[in-house]
Amino acid sequence: MKHAYIVDAIRTPFGRYAGGLAAVRADDLGAIPIAALIERNPSVNWAQVDDVIYGCANQAGEDNRNVGRMSALLAGLPVEVPATTVNRLCGSSLDAIAMAARAIKAGEAHLIIAGGVESMSRAPYVMGKSEGAFGRTQKIEDTTMGWRFINPKLKAMYGVDTMPQTAENVAEQFGIQREDQDQFAYTSQQRTAAAQAKGYFAKEIVPVTIPQRKGEPVVIDTDEHPRASTTLEGLAKLKGVVKPEGSVTAGNASGINDGAAAVLIASDEAVAQYQLKARAKIIASTTVGIEPRIMGFAPAPAIKKLLKQANLTLDQMDVIELNEAFAAQALACTRDLGLADDDARVNPNGGAIALGHPLGASGARLVTTALNQLEQSGGKYALCSMCIGVGQGIALIIERV
């Protein structure tokens, strides 16, 4: 079997909900990191790209009708380059990278752009059609996140808990205390603040320039979601999201955000032909399914399955990027895997609680950040894993070259 190499990875800053990137359409946002890859790799014959595989969780608004193809065209890729959009909700862009790697390892492709985009600020309200003339049963749904147009049969079978409710379920089932969740969130904020102060994320971010009606364009070059001023005392004052006495709060959960990320993946032949630098090898990936009501726990079985598949151990992982959808689910996973709550390998530069979680882009962000951390620390293996709504988990391992 052939190898699949990551040769470049870049992302936009992650914007706050209704923040600096809210003025940018999802398809335009998705084009930005692709265009950056084109600019950063001038030796590549871009007409020879075999595919663009982009993740996106919503696809109900400006990201409809194959946003991957739209972003590819807007980025300036030749029309001959095909593109597709995949949807595994939160795991979409990590799935896109895994799909690209499989195609290259199988010899079906040599050069693929994989990544994802999400504009949660611009997620539309939608309304279904009436089933009869002059119907009055239509309901307006907010597509920002979570369920819409719920199937009553699925509801009866598995329930349709909101994402915060699933985190509360995990906290209760696995005994994750509020204080531990807040400590985890605080650590995430502190690690991100330290990384930002050192300029750590600058090398993985392409600035977004937003024209204004009057005056100079606004340039967004820094993640907007982190709150360096977060304190444990402040977190303790927040009320539960699901219920007043609940443990899941806005402070120990990820954000609602906007962003995009793209990764250039190449075969041995493409690396040689275009004189590219192979930075990491994609070793293996996997997905699992669990009960939807505790979807946040899914990374634990996904990681166990993947390590067995790759014949590796958790001790061999130098970097572990575990998406922080909620502190409750992240802690349930790390504890099940036998990791300490403050393991320095887990999200060493903070995670989604601080950086934000634009659903379809987050997986590619994990890989981008993990790659840079491996190179900075001299580590060998990085593990990236995410929980996924409706009860799934995904995991992927890369090896620094």
Curated annotation (Swiss-Prot):
It is an enzyme of class 2 (transferase). GO terms for biological process: 3,4-dihydroxybenzoate catabolic process; beta-ketoadipate pathway. Keywords: Acyltransferase, Aromatic hydrocarbons catabolism, Transferase. The keyword Acyltransferase applies. Transmembrane segments: none annotated. Its EC number is 2.3.1.174. Belongs to the thiolase-like superfamily. Thiolase family. This is Beta-ketoadipyl-CoA thiolase. It comes from Acinetobacter baylyi (strain ATCC 33305 / BD413 / ADP1). The gene is pcaF.
